[in-house]
Amino acid sequence: MRNTVLKAVAIAVALSPAIGLAQSKATSATYITDEEVKAVNATPGVDRTIRVVDIGPENYAVGVIHRGASNAAGRGAGTGAGAGAGAGAGAGAARGAGGGAAAGAGGGAGRGGAQQGEPCGEQSTAPTTGGTPGMIAHDQQTEGYLIISGGGTLVTGGKIVNGRKSPPESEVTKVLNGPSCSGTAVGGDVVKKVVKTGDIIIIPAGVPHGWTDIGDHVDYLSFRPSARVLEAGYVNPALKK
């Protein structure tokens, strides 16, 4: 557990180098316990924000994500990545999305329901071949991942073609990642890398990302600093009981 805490601190420093230099009015620390992470991760769904904190120059969110095995039934009623990623409906839909079916499809899986947003990414009338479906890119939200259990293949890079924006009132936009674009990613700079417990990944805002080839499962913490993209003060309902 000590190593996990140290890695989490390292991610925070890497993602927010300006914290120590900015004129911040934040004067207290926020503690998220191992028990709280487990309590949130035990709830149905895939991607769940734990807390969003005002740290002065920006807001800082921490989430926990569970993805089940690729092409296997998981928690909830699995919708598949293309539907979940490209949509981003309300909280109930997101929490009901299946971890397993969503896992094999990509980063946007489980982050929404069936509502379609506006077009985004590169628009093309030509058929998209050889791309990775179910990818998502966040307009202003950088993410740092710390894999805490399991593993799989993380896909990053490229550009999204014929994507869909997350609707303004969706959970993706308001609670998880801010405005985002989901769809199939293509390009010679797409990277597919197997990641495992203990690995750290930093994904800058605007970089498409998603998952494939998850064996049993992958669980990870997501550290999300941003310039007021998410509303400070949010606390996951599982911690209010």
Each model region followed by its residue ranges:
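His/acidic/aromatic-lined binding-pocket segments of jelly-roll/cupin-type domains
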Residues: 134-137, 143-146, 192-193, 200-201
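A short hydrophobic beta-strand segment most commonly corresponding to one strand
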Residues: 216-234
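Double-stranded beta-helix
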Residues: 163-195
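Bacterial N-terminal signal peptides that target proteins for export
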Residues: 1-9
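Conserved metal-binding segment of the jelly-roll/cupin
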Residues: 194-214
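Short, conserved beta-strand element in jelly-roll/cupin
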Residues: 138-158, 169-182
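A short, N-terminal "cap"/entry segment at the start of jelly-roll beta-barrel domains
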Residues: 20-137, 233-241
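Bacterial N-terminal signal peptides
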Residues: 8-20
